[in-house]
Every structure is written in structure tokens, then in C-alpha cells.
């Protein structure tokens, strides 16, 4: 591909969604930025159903050309976002190392240079706290383009180079895949052995600090910990957090991305209220669980943790780094039972729960499909989840939307309240294949291909138009293309 990778800002505002599959108009197609310099075919003006079920997916010259150009673009994006040992999600908007971003980015880096992929994970785990927690952001270098930075998070007795909360623990999943697919087996085995004790300590921290009552499912105490920051799943629980008299602040994200695509002020006020309260407690794990006014059972965190425990168990055997696997097996056994309490029979979907009320949180989100990725659903429940997913896909042009498109809080362009995220599509696709729903997995994969082809490499995508939105030249989207969508 000639010239630099282009990441032009989106220019279309999506409105509410109808209940029938929409048609992508020719006018919309013409103004969508095609970052990969591939002409949008005439079929882009046809119905989403026609595109979705194209029989020649992954066949023929168009896909071959698209693949070559996409791979080159994605390699350039990861190279440009490389800060020397760690990768930022996107320039300006996210200038630091994010936890689950880096773990997922390592999968893409492994398709380019294995040693660099291991360095990404090693750099992330080097920020681990003494208690085992791995923070959700590591502040390697100063930056004026992001708020809240280290000056807000720092406390007298805790590190000032990171945040005081965590994120979904993807790292063990990545370590296993890198080891399994390694060409340099000696390097991979050495790095897996080096990282295993840190991974085990992190998982132990989750159960000690976030499940002290031994339920089998861990708590999340801040929306930022979920990775799905402004998901409508948190609306009810977050609304009960009283807004404290917090210092005045200026959001930096709105200087990079349209406010219509970002969390709103009332949410940010509560995010910061929680932050300042946690800092006042010096991030003491013994106090946070009991004193936080926001405590939920997040499906994304728990599903990823369960899958990561499976992979940690595999790593224990593959590396010989752990002689007693009973602790890990205990975690998975308790979780297998506990996940049943999160299944909503009427909705045909798993739901998050408010731990302070014991009630389901009302919004249906894409996290409800992740128990397939974790492998915790029975055959009957998996069938119900697959049917629900099929209905969601029928309701939009491109899946998987991050919120049920029929829900009143669905917003097609606002961050985790509607847009499609390729990392979720990858996890759900893996889960569908795990349960034998290969055709549905291909449907998700085809939608993902169309999004990248017509929308570019963005943070997320509008499920109605396919427009790329949020941050441009986005690292984990590029990584998903390299490690999944266009992987040989």
C-alpha cells in the first residue's frame, strides 16, 4: 500500500434503529472512509443481508487483494503505535499502555515478530503491584492528551506510574496462544515460564480481593475495570453512586473524538467520584470490596478470567511451572456452578448482576455471549444464546452490536452502548466454534470483514452503517485483523 495509513474522522451520525434489517444506502457508502484504499464495491449499496451471506467470502481476487492491503496497513499501525517495548491503543486519545489492549495486541505482534509480542506482555506484567494486581493503565511516559493521568491516580503509598484498578485478565490467554503457535519454541517456553508466576499471582489477587466471600465469581468495582466503560449494563448501579464534591476537571478525550461517541458528563463525574474514594482508601484491597458504592458481577471480566484460568492450567502443565494445580481447578469448578446464576431464561442470554442488590442489571449486552468463549454454558443454554445472537444480527447491518438494538438505551455510535468491537467479535466467534455453531461464527466473521473493508481500522464501528468510529489507526483492531480475520 502506497503512502501512510489514513484514519479520517467519521462524519455520519447514526440515529435510532428499526427492528428490521436496514439497508446501507449508496450515499452512506460513498462518504464512509475506506482507510485501506480499497474501492467500495457496488454491492455496498445492496442490503446487509446480501453482503452478509455472500458465498465467495474468503475466496476470489477481491479478498486476496483486501487481505494483502489490510495486513500491510495493520502492520504499519502497530509499528506507528509502538512506543519502544509497549503499544499504545491510539495516538493522542490513548497515549499509555492499557492492560487488556496490550494482551490482545500481543496476538497481532506475534504475526510480525514473536520476540516483540513477548516483550509486550513482559512490559505489561512488569507493572504488577506487590499484592498481585496488574493495573489497567501503565503511565510509562508523561502525556498531556489524556485525563485522568498519574497525578490524579497516585497515592502516597502506592505506585504513581499506574492506575489503582485492573482490567479483564486476557494475558494468560495470550501467553498460551503465543506458546502454542511459537516458531521459536525455546524463547516461548522461557518467556512463558517467566510470566507464569506473575499470571498466577494476578489470578490469586482476583479471588482474594474481589471474591472474598468465595462465590466463584469476582466483583468489579469501577466501570473502567470492565473494559466496557459506559455499557448500559452499568446505568442502574452507577446512578446510585452519589457524586462527591470532586475537583474541577477537563476531559481530554473530547478533543480527539466527537462527544456523541463518548461517555457523558454524569458518568464521568461518577467515574471520578469512585477514583477519588479509592485513592482515599489507598487502594486497600481489604476495604475496597466492602466500601465501594459500585460493585457488580461483570460477565466480560468473569468469562475472560475463567478462560484465562483454563489456559493457566494448560500453561502449568506445558511449562512445569506449577506442581499443584488444585487451586486453579478449584477456581474453575466453583465458577462453572456460579455462572448458572447469571443466565436469564426469559432473555435467552447471560446478564450482569448488581452485587449490592442481588438483581440482574437490565441491559442486554454483547458480554452476554461471552460464556460461550469461557465454555461455561450447557448445551441448552448455548442454543438459547445462539438464537438470541441470530436475532441481534438480523436487527443490524453489521454485528455484533454491544447492546441489544431493540433496547431503549441503544446508541449506535456511543462507545459501548451500541457499536461493534472486533475484539468482542473474535471472542464470540471463538465461543461459537467451541460449541459447534460454525455457520453463525462465519456470519460474525463476514460482518467483521465488511466492517474493516468499508470502514477502516477504527476503535469500533456503527452497526447500522459500518462506519468506523472512535479512535483511528487503532491497535487492537489491527491486531485482530492480523491474528484472526486475515490470519492464514
Curated annotation (Swiss-Prot):
Q: Name one Pfam family in it.
A: MGH1-like_GH
Hydrolase found in the keyword field: yes
Q: Which UniProt keywords apply?
A: Glycosidase, Hydrolase
User: Which GO terms of type biological process are on file?
Assistant: oligosaccharide metabolic process; protein N-linked glycosylation
Binding of substrate occurs at 94, 98-101, 146, 167, 227, 262, 415-416
Known regulation of its activity is: Activity is not dependent on divalent cations, but it is enhanced by Mn(2+).
Where does the record place the catalytic residues? 229 (proton donor), 459 (proton acceptor)
**Would the keyword Hydrolase be found if you checked this record's keyword annotation?**
yes
Listed GO CC annotations: endoplasmic reticulum membrane
Cite the InterPro entries for this sequence. 6-hairpin_glycosidase_sf, 6hp_glycosidase-like_sf, Glycoside_hydrolase_63, MGH1-like_GH
Residue ranges of the TM segments: none
EC number(s) from the headed UniProt entry = 3.2.1.170
As for family, the record states: Belongs to the glycosyl hydrolase 63 family.
Q: What does this protein do?
A: Catalyzes the hydrolysis of alpha-D-mannosyl-glycerate (MG) to D-glycerate and D-mannose. Can also hydrolyze alpha-D-glucopyranosyl-glycerate (GG)with lower efficiency.
Protein name as annotated: Mannosylglycerate hydrolase MGH2
Q: What is the lineage of its organism?
A: Eukaryota, Viridiplantae, Streptophyta, Embryophyta, Tracheophyta
